[in-house]
């Protein structure tokens, strides 16, 4: 793992076991997600099933017309944007009550003395149970919450809906 991180080919996103404004202090070094540092290389790797992968796949991808779950691709792009600003990447996961499932907020950013939870969606933006639960559970630490997707700017109750391409501008405000 250390060799991968030192080579800068991957980005580590650490789980925080007790989210607060001191994310680095509460990170769990044994629980993390890895993203590739080069989104172009990652895109080529996941769509190149054969030496003659059709160019139409890339055209559909760029035109948002590819019928595939691209959540992992968008999450990877967001991780790359976060770390390009010199920040570390963090996320948070916790058990749902009376369930074998977990909640997960894709990214946590420090917003001055508060936290900015960020959820990344590849398609539907109406379902955002995890970020809603996070904002309720950790309301004393949350400044605002953002859901990033391919959709236009909007608002859903207290959740700010933003296109992924706006993340660098959002991060300038932090």
Label every PLM stretch briefly:
Residues 103, 127-131:
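Residues at alpha-helix caps and immediate loop-helix transition turns in enzyme cores, especially N-
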Residues 132-135, 148:
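C-terminal structured domain segments
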Residues 134-143:
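Arginine/glycine-rich "motif VI" loop of SF2 helicases in the C-terminal RecA-like domain
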Residues 143-149:
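Short, hydrophobic beta-strand segments that form beta-sheet elements in well-ordered domains
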Residues 150-174:
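Domain-level recognition of nuclease-like catalytic cores that cleave nucleotide substrates
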């Amino acid at each position: 793992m250390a060799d991968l991180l030192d080579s800068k080919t991957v980005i580590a996103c650490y789980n925080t076991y007790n989210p607060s404004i001191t994310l680095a202090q509460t990170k769990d070094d044994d629980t993390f997600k890895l993203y590739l540092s080069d989104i172009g290389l990652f895109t080529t790797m996941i769509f190149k099933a054969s030496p003659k992968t059709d160019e139409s796949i890339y055209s559909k991808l760029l035109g948002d017309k590819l019928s595939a779950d691209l959540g992992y691709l968008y999450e990877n792009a967001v991780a790359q944007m976060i770390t390009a600003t010199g920040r570390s990447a963090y996320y948070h996961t916790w058990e749902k009550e009376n369930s074998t499932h977990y909640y997960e907020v894709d990214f946590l950013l420090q917003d001055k003395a508060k936290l900015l939870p960020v959820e990344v969606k590849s398609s539907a933006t109406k379902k955002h149970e995890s970020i809603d639960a996070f904002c309720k559970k950790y309301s004393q630490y949350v400044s605002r919450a953002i859901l990033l997707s391919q959709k236009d700017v909007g608002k859903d109750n207290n959740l700010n809906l933003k296109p992924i391409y706006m993340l660098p501008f959002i991060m300038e405000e932090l």
